[in-house]
């Protein structure tokens, strides 16, 4: 945890109000959530590796470095058009990725550190293709450093540790429930100026998924 606290400021920061508003909206939507002590992808990857969840939905390739057995990209943008092509959800297996490239997870972590992660800017002049070749040839970041003449990061072991054994914390996921339409409308339209049309689309998606209840319907928490 000390390493996490030290390296944490290098990642994106959110205000307490932003975090609380996200929790409030998730509660209104009936979405289960938990607060990770550091990186969301890291905590989710640990949960996936333990079998608590089936996959981690993220655009961040660091998810594989954290050891998630399965990663899903483009989940929320599936079917949309971007840059002239239709986006499709993509399921990525960590084991298949390692086997395809002939490396171990430890080597994948070293490769990620050389290329650049949330915790380290990377080594100048080393991209994914070059880094993979060097890692397969030399085996470790220390050996690559010796062969190519660059200095190792002072916090290398700490960064490795955050990927190989990411902190999960003691927080437990909240319970799931059905979404409350009136509460969502008040939160988004009245409280934050979202257009009625935009909120309607979101409400309709929840209804289509069978996730919506009206305020007149009791929930588990009403008893």
What are these regions (language model features)?
Residues 1-49, 69:
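Noncatalytic, basic helical substrate-engagement surface that gates or grips nucleic-acid strands
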Residues 9, 13-20, 37, 81, ...:
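N-proximal short alpha-helices
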Residues 41, 63, 204:
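Positions that flank functional sites
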Residues 45-49, 67-71, 133-135, 208-212:
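Short secondary-structure transition/capping segments
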Residues 48-51, 56-118:
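Long, highly charged, low-complexity intrinsically disordered interaction regions
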Residues 88-223:
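Non-catalytic nucleic-acid-binding/docking modules located in mid-to-C-terminal regions
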């Amino acid at each position: 945890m000390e390493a996490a606290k030290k390296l944490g400021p290098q990642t994106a920061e959110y205000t307490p109000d932003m975090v609380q508003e996200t929790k409030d909206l998730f509660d209104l939507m009936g979405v289960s959530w938990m607060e990770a002590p550091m990186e969301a992808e890291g905590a989710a990857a640990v949960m996936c590796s333990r079998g608590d969840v089936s996959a981690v939905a993220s655009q961040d390739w660091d998810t594989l470095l954290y050891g998630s057995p399965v990663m899903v990209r483009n989940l929320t943008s599936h079917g949309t058009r971007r840059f002239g092509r239709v986006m499709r959800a993509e399921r990525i297996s960590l084991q298949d990725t390692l086997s395809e490239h002939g490396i171990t997870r430890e080597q994948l972590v070293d490769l990620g550190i050389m290329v650049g992660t949330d915790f380290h800017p990377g080594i100048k002049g080393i991209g994914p293709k070059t880094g993979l070749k060097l890692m397969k040839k030399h085996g470790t970041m220390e050996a690559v450093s010796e062969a190519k003449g660059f200095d190792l990061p002072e916090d290398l072991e700490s960064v490795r540790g955050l990927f190989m054994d990411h902190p999960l914390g003691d927080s437990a996921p909240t319970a799931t429930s059905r979404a409350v339409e009136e509460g969502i409308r008040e939160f988004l339209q009245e409280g934050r100026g979202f257009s009625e049309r935009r909120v309607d689309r979101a409400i309709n998606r929840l209804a289509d998924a069978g996730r919506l209840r009206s305020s007149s319907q009791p929930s588990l928490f009403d008893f």
